[in-house]
């Protein structure tokens, strides 16, 4: 927990400061004088219903004048509690059954730790008083305080950003959240959330530690009852960021020190701002219009797992409330270790999209200045404005004058290949030296001495076999540099023909250790495996599909993200499959142009095979969940389900859609998709309606509702069985 106070400026009451709110939230603890024996106490948070059948209920002490916590314990003779939840859709009932073995949740629990900023405390107090004067049991309260305060504090540390933001922003209790950590008698510990400000207000799930990894398994997540009766509405962002000016210094020890200035416009009056940044970065100071602001940057395992993007939230409280619809300059000073060395001056950038503060990935313009050791090459998105040496440093200024969602950089000791095609330029960089993880291991060769001459054959002396270490040939990390550059330039040109121009005129491609890639606007991170001669790749990636993936698909897929993910985007996890499926199928369109339809059929057959693989419980990977579950598919029982379903099944959906529309209509639809949703987020249903516009006349599923219900919103792969007699 880090709290950086500002000097109190006249007129701001001390009660409203971030420092006091954080101290009160974590230090309030439980109130032994507010402990009650309860029987048949029940309440509901929309679809979630809780029953405190028999046990003790203790409230937390007030924080900023409001109670935000309570604990129920049924750990007494006959004690018990129960939670009941009936998911409203078949898909969500299947999800719940996948994790719990039952489609409806009716779980008895031993205890419940409650944290809330809604009216839960008042609701429970009213129920207690409605049965006459409630009987306090202070002795039990003292025991519960000793037992449960450490547990409550641990949970509050995870949720304090939201608790304090709600308290300081003075939101009405109707917009507050509710959280329950339950100790189930059969299902173990699990979490229940109700958040009226979320797109899906009800979430039930469980933190799982497995094979040195931590997961949050979403058992179910859906729109709450009262919200289902309303027309769906997007929740507007609290503020908009229109411009970034970032000055970053990379020290010789690889520590990154950054000053970020952002133009922020609150949509309404704001007393607190919530930003996100990589947990590897520490925010040291924030100023708003030059005035110091307070910072709260806690660690929060549970909430970070649920967020699913690797970022962590932090709070900023200005010296005085901000006015709505007015632009402010917010200056952040932050530092951290987001760059590591993979050996031989090959570097890995860990926080590629979150090394500076952001909030919801706004489309913004960027001015970037990087200061770094001059013996290194640093690449980033945007056009170079100035590049000079300053003693031991190199200073590079870049400008991104088109609104994009992310700024990113990479560095190393690089060789470069530059190709221009029409109005676009492709610059591809490769490492000059091989990273440690790709170095071939020395092999032992046994040297046998020559046979003995005839006159010594009577000797019983054994031949002296000598093991000699042999260094195998070292792969060239830039073996395919020219080929990769040429192919990316061709892919960019091919895609621009159908999708329109990419967001930036220069596309920079640079290597990253690992077996993945990532496409940012104007900057692609490409696996170092893609640069190697196929014959010199590690044995683990030498099968037919892996060779095709690293040689033909990966760089085209990341190039396609210039359109799908960076020009057109999505805002919610339910729709993220669209960007990966579109990017991957765009790569296959380019593969088809170069290698023919059979190459695409081979890839699709591999995708089908992977979708039909079995999980530990014997079910097919495809059955873990539908495409629209997005990040929810990262489940502990099948860690690879997310990638297999989102990429492989998503690509199949695009292929089947192409077959329904026909090539000409399908490509025209993709071009219209870019034009209609440029610099906007698209939903799955909007994509369905757009695709339906391009169906041939008389198509039997004119709105594609049956197609999407079967392949996007549901699971299952049809099986064809032929019988003859």
Spans of model-derived segments:
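Amphipathic alpha-helical substructures
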Residues: 268, 466-474, 503, 598-599, ...
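Glycine/proline-rich low-complexity spacer/linker segments in large multi-domain proteins
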Residues: 231-234, 311, 315-317, 323-324, ...
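Hydrophobic helix-coil surface modules that form long, contiguous segments used
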Residues: 224-228, 232-259, 265-271, 276-280, ...
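N-terminal, polar/Ser/Thr-rich
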Residues: 11-257, 284, 356-360, 705
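Acidic/His/Gly-enriched intrinsically disordered linker/tail segments
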Residues: 458-461, 550, 580, 584-656, ...
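Beta-strand-rich binding/interaction modules
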Residues: 271-273, 279-290, 379, 700-705, ...
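Aromatic/His-enriched, Gly/Pro-containing loop or helix-boundary segments
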Residues: 292-323, 327, 531-554
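Zinc-dependent metallopeptidase catalytic helix centered on the HExxH motif
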Residues: 489, 493-496, 542-608, 670
């Amino acid at each position: 927990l880090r709290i950086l106070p500002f000097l109190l400026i006249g007129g701001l009451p001390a009660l409203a400061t971030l420092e006091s709110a954080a101290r009160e939230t974590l230090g309030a603890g439980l109130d032994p004088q507010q402990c009650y024996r309860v029987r048949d106490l029940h309440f509901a948070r929309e679809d979630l219903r809780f029953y405190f059948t028999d046990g003790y209920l203790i409230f937390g002490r007030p924080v900023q004048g409001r109670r935000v916590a309570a604990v129920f314990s049924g750990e007494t003779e006959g004690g018990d509690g129960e939670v009941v939840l009936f998911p409203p859709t078949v898909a969500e009932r299947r999800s719940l059954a996948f994790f719990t073995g039952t489609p409806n949740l009716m779980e008895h629990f031993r205890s419940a730790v409650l944290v809330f900023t809604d009216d839960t405390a008042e609701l429970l107090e009213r129920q207690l008083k409605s049965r006459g004067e409630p009987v306090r049991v202070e002795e039990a309260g003292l025991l519960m305080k000793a037992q449960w305060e450490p547990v409550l504090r641990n949970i509050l540390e995870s949720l304090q950003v939201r608790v304090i933001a709600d308290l300081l922003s003075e939101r009405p209790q109707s917009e507050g959240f509710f959280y329950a950590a339950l100790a189930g008698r059969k299902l173990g510990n699990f979490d229940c959330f109700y958040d009226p400000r979320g797109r899906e207000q009800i979430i039930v799930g469980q933190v799982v530690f497995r094979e040195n990894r931590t997961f949050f398994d979403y058992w179910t997540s859906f729109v709450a009852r009262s919200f289902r009766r309303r027309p769906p509405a997007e929740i507007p962002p609290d503020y908009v960021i229109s411009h970034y000016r970032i000055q970053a210094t990379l020290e010789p020890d690889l520590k990154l020190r950054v000053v970020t200035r952002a133009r922020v416009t609150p949509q309404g009056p704001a007393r607190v701002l919530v930003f996100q940044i990589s947990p590897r970065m520490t925010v040291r100071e924030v100023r708003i219009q030059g005035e110091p602001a307070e910072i709260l940057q806690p660690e929060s395992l549970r909430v970070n797992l649920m967020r699913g993007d690797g970022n962590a939230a932090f709070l900023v409280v200005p010296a005085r409330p901000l006015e709505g619809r007015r632009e402010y300059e917010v200056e952040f000073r932050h530092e951290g270790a987001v760059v590591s060395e993979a050996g031989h001056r090959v570097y890995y950038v860990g926080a590629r999209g979150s090394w500076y503060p952001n909030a919801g990935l706004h489309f913004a313009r960027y001015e970037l200045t990087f200061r770094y050791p001059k013996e290194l090459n640093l690449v980033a998105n945007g056009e170079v404005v100035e590049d000079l040496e300053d003693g031991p440093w190199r200073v590079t200024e870049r400008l991104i004058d088109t609104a994009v969602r992310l700024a990113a950089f990479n560095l190393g000791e690089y060789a470069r290949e530059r190709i221009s095609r029409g109005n676009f330029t492709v610059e591809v960089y490769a490492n000059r030296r091989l990273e440690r993880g790709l170095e071939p291991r020395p092999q032992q060769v046994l040297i046998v001495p020559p046979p003995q001459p005839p006159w010594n054959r009577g000797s019983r002396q054994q031949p002296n076999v000598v093991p000699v270490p042999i260094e195998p040939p070292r792969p060239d990390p830039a073996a395919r540099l020219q080929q990769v550059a040429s192919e990316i330039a061709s892919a960019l040109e091919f895609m621009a023909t159908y999708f329109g121009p990419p967001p930036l005129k220069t596309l920079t491609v640079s290597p990253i250790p690992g077996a993945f890639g990532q496409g940012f606007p104007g900057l692609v991170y490409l696996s170092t495996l893609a640069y190697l001669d196929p014959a010199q790749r590690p044995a683990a990636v030498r099968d037919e599909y892996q060779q095709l993936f690293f040689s033909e698909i990966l760089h085209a897929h990341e190039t396609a993200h210039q359109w799908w993910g960076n020009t057109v985007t999505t805002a919610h996890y339910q729709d993220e499959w669209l960007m990966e499926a579109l990017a991957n199928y765009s790569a296959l369109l380019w593969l088809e142009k170069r290698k023919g339809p059979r190459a695409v059929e081979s890839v699709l057959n591999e995708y089908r095979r992977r979708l039909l693989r079995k999980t530990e419980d014997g079910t097919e990977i495809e059955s873990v969940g539908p495409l629209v579950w997005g990040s929810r598919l990262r489940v502990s029982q099948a860690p690879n389900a997310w990638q297999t379903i989102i990429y492989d099944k998503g690509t199949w959906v695009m292929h089947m859609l192409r077959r329904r529309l026909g090539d000409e209509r399908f490509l025209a639809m993709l071009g219209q998709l870019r034009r209609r949703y440029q610099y906007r987020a698209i939903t799955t249903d909007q994509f369905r309606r757009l695709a339906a516009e391009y169906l041939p006349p008389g198509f039997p599923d004119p709105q594609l509702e049956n197609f999407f219900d079967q392949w996007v919103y549901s699971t299952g792969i049809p099986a064809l069985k032929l019988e003859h007699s």
